[in-house]
């Protein structure tokens, strides 16, 4: 099938229906790259990638496939080959099979361009406050990404920082200020931020990746604002003016 999103989902659904082992998606790119090849000439095409790695890259902005299509393929154990409609090249295989995988630790690097950071200063440090803050955001379909809560020194008040899409900033500010279930001392916003992430299943069994990432950023005097980690992803929030440099450092 050609195209993205709906046609990808249709192709995977048909592959499931006929019990196919593999689904080939023809699109306008010749595979999945370690980072955006339009911005970084040294980006490398990935021959094989795990479903979970592809899910992370798709959720962070890779437009090769939609996250829902990757998830459907994973759930139905269908290997997906991404190939170009215009050139005859091998493409990228999305799979869970460990056969023929290299020992590469980091599979891909992604960054976002449309994030905003919100810090609520001096909220009450008690159970249910975070839920009270995020409930109206959820009802208004505002996606909250990175979340950090400071340790309360006095057990009375704390600060809560989280990120959202910059397009949702005004609505979020309004919802927080209208929320009668919480009280706080100050609300601060920063639209000039970008999330830079490294993704790789190999990080699960490789010590020192976090240190190396942070050391690389420190060597270029790039300050980290927020940190978020999972088994196969490490994300940092940095000033948007440092995002491209940070992404270049993580490629080393």
Which residues fall in each region the model found?
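C-terminal catalytic "cap/lid" subdomain
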Residues: 1-252
């Amino acid at each position: 099938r050609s195209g993205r999103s709906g046609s990808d989902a249709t192709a995977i659904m048909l592959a499931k229906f006929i019990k196919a082992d593999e689904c080939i998606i023809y699109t306008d790119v010749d595979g999945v790259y370690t980072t955006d090849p339009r911005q970084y000439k040294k980006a490398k095409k990935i021959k094989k990638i795990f479903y979970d790695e592809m899910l992370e890259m798709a959720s962070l902005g890779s437009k090769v496939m939609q996250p829902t299509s990757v998830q459907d393929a994973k759930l139905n154990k269908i290997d997906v080959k991404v190939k170009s409609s215009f050139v005859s090249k091998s493409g990228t295989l999305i799979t869970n099979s460990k056969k023929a995988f290299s020992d590469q630790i980091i599979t891909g690097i992604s960054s976002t361009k449309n994030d905003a950071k919100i810090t609520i200063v001096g909220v009450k440090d008690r159970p249910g406050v975070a839920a009270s803050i995020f409930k109206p955001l959820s009802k208004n379909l505002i996606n909250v990404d990175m979340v950090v809560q400071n340790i309360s020194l006095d057990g009375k008040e704390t600060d809560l920082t989280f990120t959202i899409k910059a397009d949702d900033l005004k609505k979020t500010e309004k919802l927080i200020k209208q929320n009668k279930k919480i009280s706080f001392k100050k609300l601060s916003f920063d639209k000039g931020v970008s999330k830079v992430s490294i993704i790789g299943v190999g990080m699960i069994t490789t010590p020192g990746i976090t240190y190396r990432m942070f050391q690389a950023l420190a060597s270029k005097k790039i300050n980290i604002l927020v940190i978020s980690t999972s088994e196969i992803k490490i994300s940092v929030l940095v000033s948007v003016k440092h995002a491209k440099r940070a992404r270049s450092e993580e490629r080393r």
